[in-house]
Regions:
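Gram-negative outer-membrane beta-barrel transporters
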Residues: 299, 395, 417-507, 594
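C-terminal beta-barrel architecture of Gram-negative outer-membrane proteins
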Residues: 79-80, 473-532, 548, 556-557
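Short acidic/polar hinge/loop motifs at secondary-structure boundaries
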Residues: 1-12, 31, 367
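Transmembrane beta-barrel wall of Gram-negative outer-membrane proteins
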Residues: 40, 47-78, 83-120, 166-172
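Acidic/polar loop-and-plug regions of large Gram-negative outer-membrane beta-barrel proteins
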Residues: 98, 105-164, 191-219
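C-terminal beta-signal and adjacent terminal beta-strands/loops
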Residues: 399, 441, 449-451, 499-504, ...
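Structural signature of Gram-negative outer-membrane beta-barrels, strongest in the C-terminal barrel
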Residues: 102, 252, 277-398, 434-436, ...
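Membrane-embedded beta-barrel scaffold of Gram-negative outer-membrane proteins
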Residues: 170, 174-182, 340, 346-352, ...
């Protein structure tokens, strides 16, 4: 989808209301391609490690009759993957029709995709991390001869299609409006081979064979998600000499049907193919209204304010979630001030109050509460012809933050739970340095302290006060560099490096939950050959990831359980962890032909 966008804007902290319902950590605003005045076509293809093949075809009719333009894209990616059998087959499409005149812009978009990926969410143990990094237990079973086999269709198979219609209108020099309607259709399943599952799990009745009671069976199941998401968003913008005022809102509704099917079973006397052994329905509604104002107080001082109301409703009746009928009403105010000291220096301060509802997985893990956040941010920006610097200090104080526990549910999704009080305090710095006409340097660093306050944990049957613990998956240090050499417009070489510090996969500061720090360095080269013919240009590219072949583990999971059966009368808390290793050095080379 990124190849069909003209810009991606990442806003840190609590997202502005104009970008949607709002966010806690960051919000991403994606703007699809603008219309093209001239017709074009391009064909791209890349090949790389692990039998990776990526193909992309993109076109535009150009502006026809000064008003109409049609554009589109078809793409396909296939790969065997680094992990055993972790193959992927991804297809995507994008179609856009545009109408424009002096004051009107209408865009109709239809895009979507289909993915088939072999499951690989089980991870590996610490011992396997040392001796068998690519091992994948998904699909593994033992046949009647006692031999290990792998089920070939242990896959995630999902399709999604999006339709959007956008209408932008400029009414006069002061007013413009935007109205959009959208609909998303999703459907798909993941398929699993299961050994010796209990009949009771699937509503099957035990039976007797030759005097022996049969209560388990090998089977193949599919767990489906069939969903619809639709709604509208709208806004009106007023501009005057010193004031920009935006008023808007939206209404969205999601309907999801989660159900399971048995498509084969070794023993299933009272079951038919594709019998549903569970069928859960859920509905989520989301309505929001906001007003945002930016006011230029003086040549140096400007103010902004943003108030939003959100109403969220949940209805669910599943075995995993239980009976849910919750309604949340949130008021989210934001305010800030900016001071332009001179043409080089700019300072800002902002405050935001945000509330966020739990998601469906959170209901599967208990009775969650909504999160509440107070976000304070202070920043300085410096701009000169050869040096740009951005610094930001933030303090985010939470009540009932839904933090990752480190555990996974039975479909590989991460679990979260509420903690009472917590905070995230940090400093972010990024810069853009022009070292010479050909060399540029873009460093960045993020330092943070992320804590659960007065965290309690039950170990060996006793509740313990662990004090202030690190929040899971929150490294204290992240740093990056991009060094680029570009002697002319046709040739560019970049060296990219990233450091991620030590982090815990759980919230109890257990050494068994540690993900070690790592550094990854990548190399990128691009060369453009300009042509004076039917072919306008040929772009060649090469990418080497992890050029130093480092053993990197960027993610994993951590869990605990109480053992009360090994030694009757006592409770022992057992810890465990799984890891997702990343590939060593790998390559991707490609070419794009522009017509």
């Amino acid at each position: 989808f990124a190849s069909s966008t003209q810009s991606l804007q990442l806003q840190r902290g609590v997202g502005t209301s104009t970008n949607g319902a709002g966010a806690f950590g960051a919000s991403l605003n994606m703007l699809t391609d603008a219309f093209s005045e001239e017709a074009y076509a391009k064909i791209s293809s890349s090949v790389g490690s692990f039998n990776t093949l990526r193909s992309n075809v993109k076109f535009s009719t150009g502006l026809m009759n000064d008003h109409f333009e049609f554009s589109g894209r078809l793409s396909r990616v296939t790969s065997d993957g680094y992990v055993d059998r972790a193959s992927s087959e991804l297809d995507g499409y994008f179609l856009q029709g545009t109408y424009k005149d002096d004051n009107t812009l209408i865009k109709a978009l239809l895009f979507g995709g289909h993915e088939i990926t072999y499951q690989a969410w089980n991870g590996i143990t610490a011992d396997q991390l040392e001796n068998d990094r690519t091992y994948n237990s998904a699909g593994e079973y033992t046949d009647d001869n006692g031999d290990t086999q792998y089920y070939e269709n242990e896959v995630d198979n999902y399709k999604q299609d999006h339709f959007q219609l956008h209408w932008y209108e400029t009414w006069n020099s002061a007013w413009n409006t935007h109205l959009a309607v959208h609909y998303t259709r999703g459907r798909g399943f993941f398929e699993q081979y299961r050994e010796e599952d209990d009949f009771a799990t699937y509503g099957l009745e035990p039976f007797t064979v030759n005097g022996e009671l049969v209560e388990t069976t090998d089977l193949i199941r599919r767990r489906w998600l069939d969903n619809d998401f639709y709604g509208t968003v709208f806004s009106a913008t007023y501009n005057s000499e010193n004031l920009e005022l935006i008023m808007g809102g939206g209404y969205n509704e999601y309907k999801g049907d989660h159900f399971g099917e048995i498509i084969w079973a070794e023993y299933a006397r009272n079951s038919e193919i594709r019998d549903r052994y569970y069928d859960d329905n859920s509905t989520k509604t989301d309505v929001n209204f906001y007003t945002k104002a930016n006011y230029q107080l003086t040549d140096q001082w400007s103010l902004f304010g943003d108030v939003q109301y959100r109403g969220v409703g949940y209805q669910a009746n599943g075995e995993d979630t239980g009976l849910v009928g919750d309604t949340f009403n949130f008021f989210n105010p934001k305010a800030g001030v900016t001071f332009d000291l001179n043409r080089n220096n700019n300072f800002y301060f902002s405050y935001a109050r945000a509330n966020r509802e739990p998601n469906r997985n959170d209901y599967e893990n208990g009775s969650p509460k909504p999160e509440k956040l107070n976000d304070f941010e202070l920043g300085w920006r410096y701009v000169s012809p050869s040096f740009q610097l951005n610094t930001n200090v933030y303090y985010m104080r939470y009540k009932d933050q839904l933090v990752l526990t480190g555990g996974l549910n039975d479909v590989g999704a991460p679990l979260r739970s509420n903690v009472g009080d917590s905070y995230r305090l940090g400093l972010e710095i990024d810069a853009n340095v022009t070292l010479s006409n050909s060399f540029k340097w873009r460093p960045n660093i993020a330092l943070s302290d992320n804590r659960n306050l007065d965290y309690f944990f039950e170990r060996d049957g006793e509740l313990q006060d662990l004090g202030n613990t690190n929040i899971a998956f929150s490294p204290k240090l992240i740093a990056g560099n991009i060094i680029t050499y570009q002697p002319n417009n046709n040739f560019q070489v970049s060296l990219l490096s990233k450091f991620v510090g030590k982090q815990y996969m759980g919230n109890i500061d257990s050494e068994g939950s540690v993900l070690d720090s790592y550094t990854q360095t990548d190399f990128n080269i691009q060369y453009t050959i300009n042509m004076n013919s039917f072919i306008k240009s040929i772009e060649l590219s090469g990418l080497v990831n992890n050029i130093f072949d480092a053993d990197i583990v960027s993610n994993g999971y951590f869990y605990t359980f109480d053992d009360d059966y090994s030694n009757p009368g006592t409770i022992t808390t057992i810890e465990g962890a799984g890891y997702y290793p990343q590939a060593g050095i790998n390559f991707l080379v490609g070419a794009t032909i522009n017509f």
